[in-house]
UniProtKB/Swiss-Prot annotation:
This is Carbamoyl dehydratase HypE. It comes from Rhodobacter capsulatus. Belongs to the HypE family. One of its GO terms (biological process) is protein maturation. Its EC number is 4.2.1.-. The modification S-carbamoylcysteine is found at residue 340. InterPro entries: HypE, PurM-like_C_dom, PurM-like_C_sf, PurM-like_N, PurM-like_N_sf. It catalyses: C-terminal S-carboxamide-L-cysteinyl-[HypE protein] + ATP = C-terminal S-cyanate-L-cysteinyl-[HypE protein] + ADP + phosphate + H(+).
Length: 340
């Protein structure tokens, strides 16, 4: 029988007919894995190559609003988990998806989110193979929360880690920074702001595969989510035990994002991104890595932003446009809550 409810009710999480109708019509009819059940049955063929290793990651998403220019919570959930696997050197393969739904949530909204997830998973080359749904009373959560876990495979011999970064290595980002954080801030409507900026949310698995093929000596990569570029670079500097220097004039920032940050007293280096990463490669492979990024739409704006140095170990410093220098520290506190 067709699902007739326009809004999610507590019965949709009760384990009975209403729950079955919701799952069959909204979830499994769209995700369509053969025999989708609570326990995914995965093939071992991906691990047949001697020396291959499994990669596993999990993340929860509570972004508000759940729909925004350039994406929605479903897109972030798929892309974010794919990206977590990809920057670790893995080939993403399988995802799980768990939903916590607030009583009263529009079923039409849920359908849109699920359709986005299916579309993004197909584009990223991954399958959503299992999931779960819970419904809570009004006010117990805020609309829709999503948790995704991902499994991928790291090919034999591939070693990517922050501790491998060495002085002289080049830092490359794949495009303009801060668009996602700025988009969420404007979309909330708390301030009288109008903007044409859209979230940069994108799956980066294919881009990472191309970069690794072009620059096999790649040292490390990080996706630039909460805490932005600044926090990711600090984590790498502290783990690698070397210093990092970035050039203010090289940072790819839209004037609209810079202007928004100036008005609100924010630093764009700490704004979240959902489709941006930084990779560190030996200088001899930097040109090849750049070319590989720029050949893909999600890397068209790739550029070099800095490099690793032997001095000031564990610190990130920025050469300013005026010829000075300042320390770029880890984010303290929270610039913008619930951005992913």
């Amino acid at each position: 029988m067709a699902l007739r409810d326009e809004r999610v009710t507590l019965a949709h999480g009760g384990g009975g007919k209403a729950m079955r109708d919701l799952i069959e019509e909204v979830f499994t009819s769209v995700f369509q894995p053969p025999g989708m059940e609570d326990q995914a049955r995965l093939t071992e063929a991906a691990l047949a190559e001697p020396g291959a290793r499994l990669a596993f990651t999990t993340d929860s998403y509570v972004v508000t609003p759940v729909e925004f220019p350039g994406g929605d919570i479903g897109k972030i959930a798929v892309c974010g988990t794919v990206n977590d696997l990809a920057v670790g050197g893995a080939r993403p393969l399988w995802l799980s998806a768990a939903f916590i739904l607030e009583e009263g949530t529009e079923v039409a909204l849920l359908r849109r989110i699920v359709a986005t997830m299916a579309r993004e998973a197909e584009a990223a080359g991954v399958r959503i193979v299992t999931g779960d749904t819970k419904v809570v009373g009004r006010g117990a959560c805020d609309g829709v929360f999503v948790t995704t876990s991902g499994v991928g495979v790291i090919p034999p011999g591939r070693e990517m880690a922050a501790g491998r970064v060495r002085p002289g290595d080049v830092a490359i980002v794949n495009g303009v920074l801060g668009d996602h954080g700025a988009t969420i801030l404007a979309a909330r409507g708390d301030l009288a702001l109008t903007s044409d900026i859209e979230s940069d949310c994108a799956a980066l698995g294919h881009l990472m595969a191309d970069v690794i093929a072009a620059a096999p000596g790649i040292r490390a990569a990080r996706d630039l989510t909460r805490g932005g570029l600044a926090s990711a670079l600090n984590e790498i500097a502290q783990t690698a035990g070397c210093g990092l220097v970035i050039e203010e004039t090289a940072l790819p920032l839209r004037p609209e994002v810079v202007g928004l940050c100036e008005i609100l007293g924010l630093d764009p280096l700490y704004l979240a991104n959902e489709g941006r990463l930084v990779v560190f490669v030996p200088e001899a492979e930097a040109a090849a890595a750049l070319a590989a990024m720029r050949a893909r739409p999600e890397g068209a704006g790739a550029c070099v932003v800095g490099r690793a140095v032997a001095e000031h170990a564990g610190q990130v410093r920025m050469r300013t446009a005026f010829g000075g220098a300042r320390i770029v520290d880890m984010l303290v506190g929270e610039q913008l809550p619930r951005i992913c």
